[in-house]
Amino acid sequence: MDSFLDLFDPGTSPPTNCDVWPEDDDDASRLPPEPQMGNVEYKLKLTSPSKLRFEHLVTQLKWRLREGHGEAIYEIGVEDTGKLTGLSSDDMKSSLITLDQMALKLGATTSVLRERSVRKDKIVAEVLVRKVPDDQECIEVMVAVLGGADAGKSTLLGVLAHGEFDNGRGSARLNVLRHLHELRSGRTSSISHEILGFDTEGDVINYQKARTAEEIRDRSSKLITFLDLAGHKKYLKTTVAGLSGYCPNHVMLVVSSPAVNVSSPTQLDMTKEHMDLALALRLPFCIVVTKTDITPADNTINWLESVLKSIGCRKVPLVIKSDDDVITASSTQPTQNVVPIFTISSVTGENLDLLTRFLYVLPPSISIKEKERLEQECCQFQIDEIFKVPDIGTIVGGVLTQGVVNIATELVIGPLDNGTFVPVTVQSIHRNKAPCRVVKATQSASLNLEKAIPGLRNGMVLLGLGVNHSACMFFQARIVVLYHATSIHNGFQTTVHIGNIRQTAAIVAIMECDKRGMHTNDSASVIFKFARHPEYVTEGMRLLFREGQTKGIGIVTQVFALQVVAG
């Protein structure tokens, strides 16, 4: 989606519900031509359409909403060529009324994001149309929160989710941390979830306005699920597993402004490490600079800009200072390598409104077509957490990567240590801490299984009965070595992350490689062997391996199925 940032500067007299921009040079009064695909629609005007024309417009809006996974952007007063012609005040009012009626026909809502004057009496407007898909309770986006220890991640999530500022000594994070040792140290060591909702008007729905997670979900048209990941180096494997296993849509990288100003090597190294993870997994990310009430963010921004513009990154930093920057960042981030940078304080609340506005307009990263395709596939649920609750039984938490699971669905779980799978039945489903009857592809959930199964572990999968249930000890992958101090040869052992799988594996064969072995930036096909037990791996899965300073990425190209002996 292209927007107006490059065309004008923000004005100084905004109306009540939207932003207004002053006139700009005629040379700049143009957007790129209207895209044929996607969720952006240009309309010169929508005044007094005939009944037939209105039905056509509704059909067109329905298609744009489908393309945008429930969200569409209408540029009113703009020709198909991208020229900003503009409308009179009366025509704009009439066009917005028509757009409201179109949205109402589909059960959608509209909100004016911004307006701009292009001539003395002509204006253009950018309007967000949002409709929760019929088979969904709300539009959902998962955001993984990364950052070094003491960067303020949990404190920031506590402020966002509970609506109360921090007292400067970590009071806000007490609502987020899960374990006693976390409360004592103030450091996250496990993966936790927090939610933040938005209603149709863009107002925040959090625990300050709702008592339970279920109420937040019921009152929200859009729900942000935060994945709070550990920042300390000794928990890095847990952090990588969370990123790889939960498949988040976006990453929010939190950086402490004081740490950069005092050049803390641990903080800076972990910031770069986490940024490399997001880049390796091809996840769009934004950066939040915290603790600006203690230290100004100028030096931090300069350092971040130099890192983002470096050869290994090649991103375009955009410091967010206004609502205009927010809208532009959300629209250009996926396609133009833009990385938004927010400077906030969890104590004073400085610029928190800009961050929440960004989360409100943040688009889902998967198209409706791709989601529908995944839902048609046979079920595959990746298990990331296992709980045994007295009088209830076994509960597994994770992400449904494909298919649909209902209550009473019959599945198989595995692989066990001998490579076999065991039949199970789903008794109940919980999502966002509330019961539900169905979970669909890309959604995270907790499933209560019918019976207890010995030997369950993280990294297992639940599969539909129509899937080939073959585990493996050996698999082949095409890998790229991102960094290694010396050379990699046969026998090299590393921790491999494939989806929710985390296990030590050894390289037993390297193809297309001479006696020198593999070095930094080298690429080759290799065969891995798992060290402990078989795993469920399929061709095309992305992998990430690391051992100490060694890092690499790759794609699984072939799987050698384990032969299970009957009986």
How should these model regions be labeled?
Residues 1-137:
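Polybasic/polar functional segments that serve as interface/processing modules
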Residues 76, 150, 156, 186, ...:
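Residue-level signature of catalytic and energy-coupling elements of molecular machines
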Residues 98, 155-160, 192-194, 235-238, ...:
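Alpha-helical scaffold elements adjacent to nucleotide-binding pockets in ATP/GTP-utilizing enzyme cores
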Residues 132-150, 566-567:
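Glycine-rich adenosyl-nucleotide cofactor-binding module
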Residues 138, 294-296, 452-567:
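C-terminal effector modules of nucleic-acid-centric enzymes and ribosome-associated factors
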Residues 142-236, 246-258:
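P-loop NTPase switch module centered on the Walker A-proximal segment
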Residues 142-154, 158, 162, 306-485:
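Conserved catalytic-core segments of large NTP-driven translation/proteostasis enzymes
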Residues 222-225, 229-236, 246-273, 279-299:
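Conserved Switch II/interswitch segment of TRAFAC-class P-loop GTPases
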